[in-house]
């Protein structure tokens, strides 16, 4: 009887402190986004013959993603991605305001038009090239146009956050993808 009187309060106290029941597993994913926010580039100033064919976005657990499809003509290898005070329209240099706390400029050594001058990528609403409503980090994706073998995309982000850039080869399709991942937050 004495043993029961002692065990019942002891078990109740242990349960209240979380000693008996294991803590619930952390449901948040493990996000390794230590990419930094410094510029990333490969041959950034060279114009190219490759053709921009599409721009799209996606959401992931730890980052938002923008993908640029490039039809490879001569080996797509000229691009740069960096935070800038303001993005500018290709050709005219006019400032293009973006929503969000920071502007990422994506400069491509690829054209948005073919040899006959026909657009290979021409969104109906260039300032809203991709619908990113409801995304955690992305606030706006704008097509900045194409001029003299170069094209530009502006990405408005919630804040200056880490990002990474990957070029995925197209293989036999000859359609490479420039992938820009922008983290949801800095890792502490």
In which residue ranges do the predicted regions lie?
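Secretory targeting and sorting signals
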Residues: 1-27
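Short linear recognition/processing motifs and adjacent strand/loop elements at protein termini
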Residues: 26-188
């Amino acid at each position: 009887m004495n043993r029961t009187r002692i065990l019942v309060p002891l078990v109740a106290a242990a349960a209240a402190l979380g000693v008996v029941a294991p803590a619930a597993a952390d449901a948040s994913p493990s996000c390794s986004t230590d990419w930094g926010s410094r510029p990333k580039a490969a041959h950034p100033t060279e114009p190219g013959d490759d053709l921009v064919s599409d721009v799209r976005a996606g959401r992931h657990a730890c980052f938002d993603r923008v993908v640029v499809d490039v039809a490879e003509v001569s080996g797509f290898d000229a691009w740069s991605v960096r935070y800038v005070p303001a993005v500018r329209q290709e050709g005219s240099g006019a400032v293009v305001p973006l929503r969000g706390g920071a502007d990422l400029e994506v400069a491509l050594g690829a054209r948005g038009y073919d040899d006959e001058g026909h657009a290979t990528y021409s969104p109906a609403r260039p300032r809203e090239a991709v619908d990113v409503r409801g995304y955690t980090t992305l606030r706006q994706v704008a097509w900045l146009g194409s001029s003299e073998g170069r094209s530009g995309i502006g990405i408005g982000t919630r804040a200056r956050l880490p990002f990474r850039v990957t070029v995925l080869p197209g293989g036999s399709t000859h359609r490479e993808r420039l992938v820009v991942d922008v983290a949801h937050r800095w890792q502490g």
